[in-house]
Each structure stands twice: as structure tokens, then as C-alpha cells.
A protein has these predicted regions:
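Non-catalytic accessory segments flanking enzymatic or RNA/DNA-binding domains
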Residues: 1-98
Length: 98
């Protein structure tokens, strides 16, 4: 049985960050996008690390907005191994062209 992946999704309009877990982060993105007026992008996923979700939610609790959504300012508090996997330059290009 496959372990859940940890994923990081960002909203284009608000910059909000969602940290969650799913067996299929791409499918989860599509579910979240349905009915959401803001464009969402999967900005990072980590195979088999879904078990770290709760720890990250606790670590970032100061930045929590609602449920699993956090203000953009939380990125400075992300563990280095997660922060470094996000391709920030490519992300800027994506938001600017969509």
C-alpha cells in the first residue's frame, strides 16, 4: 500500500499556501480547484511524507488562516528541505502568464 504524499498548493490571488496529504496530489489539486475562483498550483509534493503534515501544521500554526490554509508568510518557516524543492522562479513565471 502506498503511503500518502505531502503536498504544498498555492492560490494565485491570495498567495495562501495549503499543506496537506494525499495518495494523489494532482487529483487532490483538481478536487480543490473545482468551484474555486482562484487558480491553484501544486508547487511541491513529497512522496511518502504525508505523515509530516500534522507536524508542519503545528509548526506553522501562527500563520494558519483556515483549516489547512496558511498565509504566504509561512514560507519563511518551512523546513529547508521543503522550501528548497519549490521552484520559486518557475512559480513566478507561471503566475505571471496565467
Amino acid at each position: 500500500m502506498k503511503n500518502d504524499d505531502l503536498y504544498v498548493i498555492q492560490s494565485d490571488n491570495t498567495g495562501m499556501i495549503k499543506i496537506g496529504r494525499s495518495i494523489n496530489p494532482e487529483k487532490r489539486l483538481k478536487q480543490l480547484q473545482t468551484g474555486n475562483p482562484n487558480k491553484l498550483k501544486l508547487i511541491a509534493s513529497f512522496e511518502g511524507l504525508g505523515w509530516k503534515e500534522k507536524m508542519l501544521h503545528e509548526q506553522l500554526s501562527f500563520y494558519r488562516l483556515e483549516g489547512e490554509w496558511f498565509s504566504y508568510e509561512c514560507v519563511g518557516e518551512l523546513p529547508l528541505n521543503i522550501y528548497e524543492k519549490i521552484e520559486w522562479g518557475a512559480l513566478d513565471d507561471w503566475w505571471n502568464n496565467n
